[in-house]
């Protein structure tokens, strides 16, 4: 009886050492995926071949008339060849839509691809030239007199309400000007091209003195930014969105790309933590709950301070949930001893569950105990 008990226990422990082949340690998700793969990988070509063979056996090949089955008996009796009532057309229709004598003509007479054009291809209400849209005497003119591709332009091509220049949109004296006086491509700009409500510079949107400034004073591409380019309500830095002193900060004080975060980057209403949504410290929603702990980040930084760079470091744990860090771009040249939490980007990393390791250890320990009992009893 004693030997039987030892044999049973040893069998259980040996089976438990192979979790991928035994019942209680089987990963059900992998098993389900395996079954799904086996089911989804059925070769459908054999089914298609069987279907084609069945159709051929019934005389339903391509190009045959299904009504021939009912008329076979009559044909054999009469000995005459039956003529189809509606002969099939094997040729495709030409791509001409309302065109006489030419392909792909849309209401065109005598030419291809002409849309309401007389005597030329691809003319849209054009007289004597191709691709003219309400143009007289030139191709591709849209309400233009004497030039191609002019849109309400006098004397030049591609002018949209422009006088004397091509491609001018409400521009005086220059091409491609949109409500600009004296320069090309200016949108409500005075004296420069491509200026949108900008004075003295190109591509300025409500910017004074610089190009591409959107409500920015003194710099290009500034959106409500004072003194820097591309600043959105930012003071002193580029691309800052309601951020003071840093670029690309969204309601963040002192850090870039922070969303209502104080002291950290990309924090959503988080105080003292990075990327925390409505969370102070640990937080109460999913984002806050998944935010890395500041203490653990500091401890991990002390371990990898000498090797941390702009690439992600390995996870701080070998199983379970840990953290990983990397330098920000603006701190790439900092000395390792000068690094702080504000110079780092943190991320939560999840490794394999530790249950598998514990199972192997416990099973091995149980097997050792069993062997000791078997040898010394």
Curated annotation (Swiss-Prot):
Residues 80-88 are annotated as: Required for the binding to heparan sulfate proteoglycans (HSPGs) on the surface of host hepatocytes. Pfam families: TSP_1. Disulfide bonds join 315-349, 319-354. Residues 95-274 are annotated as: 20 X 9 AA tandem repeats of [PA]-G-D-R-A-[DA]-G-Q-[PA]. Sequence repeats lie at residues 95-103, 104-112, 113-121, 122-130, 131-139, 140-148, 149-157, 158-166, 167-175, 176-184, 185-193, 194-202, 203-211, 212-220, 221-229, 230-238, 239-247, 248-256, 257-265, 266-274. The N-terminus is involved in the initial binding to heparan sulfate proteoglycans (HSPGs) on the surface of host hepatocytes. The N-terminus masks the TSP type-1 (TSR) domain which maintains the sporozoites in a migratory state, enabling them to complete their journey to the salivary gland in the mosquito vector and then to the host liver. The unmasking of the TSP type-1 (TSR) domain when the sporozoite interacts with the host hepatocyte also protects sporozoites from host antibodies. The TSP type-1 (TSR) domain is required for sporozoite development and invasion. CSP has two conformational states, an adhesive conformation in which the TSP type-1 (TSR) domain is exposed and a nonadhesive conformation in which the TSR is masked by the N-terminus. TSR-exposed conformation occurs during sporozoite development in the oocyst in the mosquito vector and during host hepatocyte invasion. TSR-masked conformation occurs during sporozoite migration through the hemolymph to salivary glands in the mosquito vector and in the host dermis. Glycans are attached at residue 318. InterPro entries: Crcmsprzoite, TSP1_rpt, TSP1_rpt_sf. Residues 1-22 form the signal peptide. This is Circumsporozoite protein. Residues 303-355 form the TSP type-1 domain. Gene3D superfamilies: Thrombospondin type-1 (TSP1) repeat (2.20.100.10).
């Amino acid at each position: 009886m004693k030997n039987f008990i030892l044999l049973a226990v040893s069998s259980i422990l040996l089976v438990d050492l192979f979790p991928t082949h035994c019942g209680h340690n089987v990963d059900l998700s992998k098993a389900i995926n395996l079954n799904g793969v086996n089911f989804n990988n059925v070769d459908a070509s054999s089914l298609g071949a069987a279907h084609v063979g069945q159709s051929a056996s019934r005389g339903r090949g391509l190009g045959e008339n299904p009504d021939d089955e009912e008329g076979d008996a009559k044909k054999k009796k009469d000995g005459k060849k039956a003529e189809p009532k509606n002969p099939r057309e094997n040729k495709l229709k030409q791509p001409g839509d309302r065109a006489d004598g030419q392909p792909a003509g849309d209401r065109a007479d005598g030419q291809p691809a002409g849309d309401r054009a007389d005597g030329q291809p691809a003319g849209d209400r054009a007289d004597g030239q191709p691709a003219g849209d309400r143009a007289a005497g030139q191709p591709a003119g849209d309400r233009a007199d004497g030039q191609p591709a002019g849109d309400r332009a006098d004397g030049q091509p591609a002018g949209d309400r422009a006088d004397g220049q091509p491609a001018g949109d409400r521009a005086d004296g220059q091409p491609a000007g949109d409500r600009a006086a004296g320069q090309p491509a200016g949108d409500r700009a005075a004296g420069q091209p491509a200026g949108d409500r900008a004075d003295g510079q190109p591509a300025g949107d409500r910017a004074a003195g610089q190009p591409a400034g959107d409500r920015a004073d003194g710099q290009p591409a500034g959106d409500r930014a004072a003194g820097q380019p591309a600043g959105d309500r930012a003071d002193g830095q580029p691309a800052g969105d309601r951020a003071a002193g840093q670029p690309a900060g969204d309601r963040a004080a002192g850090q870039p790309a922070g969303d209502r975060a104080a002291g950290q980057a990309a924090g959503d209403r988080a105080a003292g933590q990075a990327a925390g949504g409505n969370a102070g410290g640990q937080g109460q929603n999913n984002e806050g709950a998944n935010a890395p702990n500041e203490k653990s980040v500091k401890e991990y930084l002390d371990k990898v301070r000498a090797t941390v760079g702009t690439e992600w470091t390995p996870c701080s744990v070998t199983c379970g949930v840990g953290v990983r860090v990397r330098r920000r771009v603006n701190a790439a040249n900092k000395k390792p001893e000068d690094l702080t939490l504000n110079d780092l980007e943190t991320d939560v990393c999840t490794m394999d569950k530790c249950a598998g390791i514990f199972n192997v250890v416990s099973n091995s320990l149980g097997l050792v105990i069993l062997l000791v009992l078997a040898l010394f009893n």
